[in-house]
Curated annotation (Swiss-Prot):
It comes from Anopheles gambiae. Mg(2+) binds at residue 39. Its EC number is 3.6.1.66. It is an enzyme of class 3 (hydrolase). This is Inosine triphosphate pyrophosphatase.
Amino acid sequence: MARPISFVTGNAKKLEEVRAILGARFPREIVAVKLDLPELQGEIDDICKLKCLEAARQVKGPVMVEDTCLCFNALKGLPGPYIKWFLDKLGPEGLHKLLDGWEDKSAQAVCTFAYTDRPDGEVILFQGRTEGDIVAPRGPRDFGWDPVFQPTGYDQTYAELPKPKKNEISHRYRALAKLAEHFADESK
């Protein structure tokens, strides 16, 4: 039997969402591992690959890491991979106000999972994107920037959407669908 995949996260809500999206049919067990990984700067693909290799070195086995970006088109992709710090300093209201001087409120939610089976292994990336707009905060404020991101074609923010609906359309869902497909192909 294949070893479990260590998902590096300290965020219980993220783990819950990943397990809900992958479902019981996913062929590998996912276990949460909290590691102290360096906070890297750069492009998302590079950040994910380096974080994944460092996590695999520490775990000494199969790992996956996730990095999420919120890219404002008017700001040429910022805050991007630095959304965590923007949110910490500005809160949801501040994220919305960043675009006060811009007509363009469009954004992309981007999720990238990186997987490797060993410290010296190839890192495989699985990326999902959802288009939307940055709006005044609405809905519960218990999961990051969900209150300010309204996906295109919906009149509710991620925070307002029922969890099952969000999990069918989100950037994380799109990335995990690619990851699940990879493991389904691998198990054939």
